[in-house]
Amino acid sequence: MTFSRRSFMKTAAATGALTALGRPVLAQGIRWDMADEYGEQALSGKASKYFLEQLNAKIGDALTITYQGGGALGYNSVDHFDAVQDGAVQAAVTLVTQLGGIDPFFNLSSLPFIASTPEEAMMLWQAAREEYAKIFEENGMVLLWAMPNPPSGINAPEPITSPEALEGLRIRTYDVNGTNTMMNAGAAPLQVAWSDLIPQLSTGGIDAVLTSADGAMQLSLWDYVSDFTELNYAMGLFMCHVNKDEFDALPEDVQTAIMEILPACDEYNWSIMVDSIQTAYDTMEENGMTITLDDDVPAEVFEFLQEAGTSVREDWVAQTGERGQAVLARFEELKSQAG
């Protein structure tokens, strides 16, 4: 009889004992890895640390999850879906807007200007969470929590204060939505993975970067560009997802403990995202970067980018059909209720 790694984990979980405290343990313990393309100082890393701390407080060493940040396991976000689905790694924190090729619904959170504030980004997550969870479940995974990126802006050699500033700009984008929007705006976008960004800047492959202020701070982009323009373009979501076979193999009270801490994780993640914005601005200015806030960006720039993103939003609705329409309707309802 041949035993796969998954069947072994199920058997091990089923034969585990309980400590006197009622915490489930196994003879060898249950150990997982959690992949993250980004590092422990990035917001995805901080969100992962909080999740692991909260889990440890509830279950002790019944489940040990090792955070593997900075692409330590050799996976980028675009690889995580297959890696977790196949059981090559038990868990991952993934920038899901890079998974649009698997299901276009994943592109929702990076639709240009759909959510313009952290509060709206939370409402969009609440409106769409059920559909996200369904996609993961249908592919052998369990969705846990989300971590929003701070609003994206443009790091460039000069502020983006006119549509002409985008013309021919060789700009890094992080997903298909950004690529198509920037192309429509007359720029020359190139989708570049996080790990390849600095080499591209160093060799002149790109001149500008579409990312958040926190991302700019993490990469010390002041070494390459002088300006950050606040555009509140999008707040793409990271999501933590785990292999369903591995999750189902856990003792029931461990599964329950994981699910119980998820609301606290979302609340914490949104709070650190909001706090990160001013922290990043302060650090960038201390290192010589000029920050152009959205109030100082001419209205014509936003109107121009809104127009450039119109077809991107329309295409997403066409690709996702009733699913997309239903989620957008729920999103508008939540916004209306919030006043």
Each language-model region and where it sits:
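N-terminal secretory/targeting leader peptides
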Residues: 2-22, 26-120, 128, 132, ...
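Short beta-strand-centered segments that line the small-molecule binding cleft or hinge
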Residues: 123
